Amino acid sequence: MNMNKIALVYNENSKSSSSIEEIKKLYTYCDVEDADVIMVAGGDGELLHNIHRYMHLNIPFYGVNLGSLGFLMNPLDIKNILQNIQESTASTLNPLLMQAEDVDGQIHKALAINEVSIFRKTNQAAKFRIEVNGVERMSELVADGALVATPAGSSAYNLSAGGHILPLESNMLCLTPICSFRPRRWHGALLPSSASIKFEILNTNKRPVNATADFQEFSNIKSVTIKSTNDKSIKLLFNKNHTLEDRIIKEQFGG
């Protein structure tokens, strides 16, 4: 893969401005639209924002970690950044498409790289019905919320909520309840990536619910349909000795 033209994007208000200045001195960067690869300096959040902003260009992303966890990022190695990009391996991600209908009948669509989540808006637990591929699988779940995570997002909010970590090539989605009250011992489900998942919110007046696709939030939702998109894909580049698959395995052993 030809990766001679590199664009650099970052948060100009970043606390890691000294590291960014060092990275800027390494190379003569080009505009994003002309790039072979987009280098994102920051954390996972910065990478996600830029994926959403530029995914339509079909250009690979290479993340450089200036944040804390940086699960989707590569370690900061200023001296070898350019070489690491040239020798990197690519992982392909398919985002989720969320279609949410609010109580006024408006339809909201958004893409999610990590997860789509629904959660209670007040102090009362949410109640919802779950369908998979048009078949009712749970007539009532009482919980703070629920989420559907991609393999790339399974080690983020999903893991903190008690969900499973999914290998990147598993072609599966993880449906995880958030603080499930009834059924109390239900820990979620692993579903094929081809599944269409629908949450129908029960008692929306008394128990209002919001929905998010990554960082995009929509209020007072009455139903949410989630499915993986095959017509859109994102390529993330990882150092050859620090692949995303390696990180997913390591995370399952407390690494």
Curated annotation (Swiss-Prot):
Domain of life: Bacteria
GO biological process, one term: NAD metabolic process
Recorded catalytic activity of this chain's protein: NAD(+) + ATP = ADP + NADP(+) + H(+)
Keywords of this entry: ATP-binding, Cytoplasm, Kinase, NAD, NADP, Nucleotide-binding, Transferase
Transmembrane segments: none
HAMAP family given in the database record: NAD_kinase
PANTHER family cross-referenced by the UniProt entry: NAD KINASE
Descriptive protein name: NAD kinase
Lineage: Bacteria, Pseudomonadati, Pseudomonadota, Alphaproteobacteria, Rickettsiales
